[in-house]
Every structure is written in structure tokens, then in C-alpha cells.
Amino acid sequence: RTIASFGGGMKHFKLPEDFEDQIRKFFGNVVFSTAYGMTEMTWLASQCPHGFYHLSPTVLPLILNESGEALVEPHEGLVTGRFGFVDLLADIRWGGMISGDKVTVDLDGNCPCGMSGTVVHSVGRFDSSLGDDKIQCSGTIDAYIRGAVVD
């Protein structure tokens, strides 16, 4: 059996509608596994059969406005904005991050699969063509460390 796993590097990439069939034709019996994650975090959000990502209970999501300066108020549990989070398992650095990802999240944890906890409905990137989007996890870490060293 072959396992095909796709990560977050495909936010600007559109696969053909029949990509799974093409992969199965080449490899045979394939199990598809998709997760959302990034190098700077200690967890992966697995995708359920309904196409949603489920965050680890060790992650405190902070959905921010596009500039990353303020929290966005949820509307009936759903909130869309820049994905920030506090990773409670980070132990060699501060666990707070602000990413360049634009997400829609259900903070009430409503998912047809029955799994509880925060549900990420969609993941994309803020359009860097509208301005140079320099907000990213590595920049968050750099700013924190630089601030700690300067102070």
C-alpha cells in the first residue's frame, strides 16, 4: 500500500480535479493523508473525511485581522482572518506565532465527522500581490528574539 500525503506548500497551487485518480493509476492502491502544519509548530492538524482540519487541543488559535494587529470577532462561531496561535508545547522558544495564512475557523467545533475542538474550514494565503506580506512565523520568532535581546 502507498500513502500519499500533501502538506501546506500547495496554497497557491491548484491540482487537477482528477489528481487522485492519476496518482492511483500510477501507484495502485493509495491512501491519501492530508494535514495542515508549518515548521514552526509542534503539531499537525489532520484533515478529516469531510475535508476539514482539526487543531490539537494544545493549540490556542488567535484569528487576527489582515495586518495581524487585532483579533477578529467571530460570527456565529465562524471567523476568517490571519492565523495566529499559541503553541502550548513549544519549550525552546515562545510559542506565539502569527502566520501569513488566511483561515476560516469554527471556534465552536462543529464538524460532521463528530470530532470536537477547533475546526479549520479553509486555508489560503493573504494576497501578496496587493502589497508585500512580510508577516510570517519566522518573522514572529525573529521579532520576539530581537526584542528579548534589545531589552
Task: Tell me the role of every PLM-derived stretch.
Residues 1-151:
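Active-site glycine/GP-rich loop and adjacent strand/helix microenvironment
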